[in-house]
């Protein structure tokens, strides 16, 4: 490994610094991507995509991986689930615990790397593993992630994932045109995509001190294969034309706090969702 090449663990540590810094910015967000005041008034933060696919979660034990500061975790708790949220940012976990106390919702929150989720949360203890929106692009190894999710589930338990479509992750926009810019697959430290950004995708325009981060693109074929090899049976795979944030400049507001490309623009799917069941 070259002297200036970071390991995957070091790259994730760089990302954690950025996510630590993003927490207060996102809590103060008034763009609608994170609506903390609305949540505190009783609004549910789950989007129509998740709402139509996860079913009744009342009484279910749910592990929410990469939960950020817990809005979706607490929305699941509001629906009657027993929720444990896991995130690698201590700032996020502290904020999530504060929101749980403020709302009186009984979710628990644990700080830890998602790859160590079984050590933090225990094996085979959950009816559902829930993962949503901007999660797996931060992971260098999708097969390892799928194996962890599978080990958290009881036999017959379900994984639910809704996230950015990998085809959109490959694109940048130049003069209103979509341009394939990034490879369809990146894995591990050597293939990590390095980015620099001055501001977060949500918030009040605050300038970030931690500007660098790393991302990884996992094609749908790799995700589905990882689930199968990890002991999960695919139940459904859906593609969507809406996303909870404007992933590229041409995306416009859509119903339910989502964003999409204009009708006249030829564009790929921007999101996908899937459900899978742990094999007995």
Residue positions per predicted region:
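A short acidic, Gly/Pro-enriched loop at the edge of an enzyme's catalytic core
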Residues: 119-129
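A short glycine-rich, Lys/Arg-flanked "PGG" loop and its adjoining helix->strand segment in the class I
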Residues: 143-158
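Acceptor-substrate binding/catalytic loop of class I
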Residues: 163-178, 206-222
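Conserved class I S-adenosyl-L-methionine
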Residues: 158-201
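Conserved alpha-helix/loop element of class I SAM-dependent methyltransferases that forms part
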Residues: 31-60
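A short SAM/SAH-binding and catalytic strip from SAM-dependent methyltransferases
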Residues: 127-143
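Class I SAM-dependent methyltransferase SAM/SAH-binding core
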Residues: 60-117
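Short alpha-helix
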Residues: 214-237
């Amino acid at each position: 490994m070259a002297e200036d090449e970071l390991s995957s663990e070091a790259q994730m540590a760089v990302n954690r610094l950025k996510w630590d810094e993003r927490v207060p910015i996102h809590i103060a967000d008034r763009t609608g991507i994170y609506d903390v005041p609305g949540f505190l008034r009783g609004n549910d933060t789950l989007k129509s995509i998740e709402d139509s696919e996860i079913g009744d979660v009342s009484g279910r034990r749910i592990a929410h991986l990469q939960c950020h500061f817990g809005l979706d975790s607490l929305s699941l708790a509001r629906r009657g689930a027993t929720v444990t949220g896991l995130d690698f940012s201590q700032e996020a976990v502290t904020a999530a615990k504060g929101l749980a106390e403020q709302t009186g919702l009984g979710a628990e929150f644990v700080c830890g790397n998602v790859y160590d989720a079984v050590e933090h949360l225990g094996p085979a203890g959950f009816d559902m593993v829930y993962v949503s929106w901007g999660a797996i692009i931060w992971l260098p190894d999708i097969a390892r992630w799928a194996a962890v999710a599978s080990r958290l589930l009881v036999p017959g338990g379900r994984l639910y994932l809704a996230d950015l479509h990998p085809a959109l992750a490959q694109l940048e926009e130049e003069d209103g045109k979509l341009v394939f810019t990034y490879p369809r697959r990146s894995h591990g430290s050597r293939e990590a995509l390095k980015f620099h950004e001055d501001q977060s995708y949500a918030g009040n325009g605050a300038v970030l001190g931690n500007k660098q981060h790393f991302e990884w693109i996992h094609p749908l074929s790799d995700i589905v294969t990882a689930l199968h090899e990890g002991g999960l049976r695919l139940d459904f795979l859906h593609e969507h034309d809406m996303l909870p944030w404007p992933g590229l400049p041409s995306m416009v507001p859509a119903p339910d706090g989502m964003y999409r490309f204009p009708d006249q623009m030829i564009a790929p799917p921007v999101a996908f969702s899937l459900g899978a069941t742990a094999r007995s």
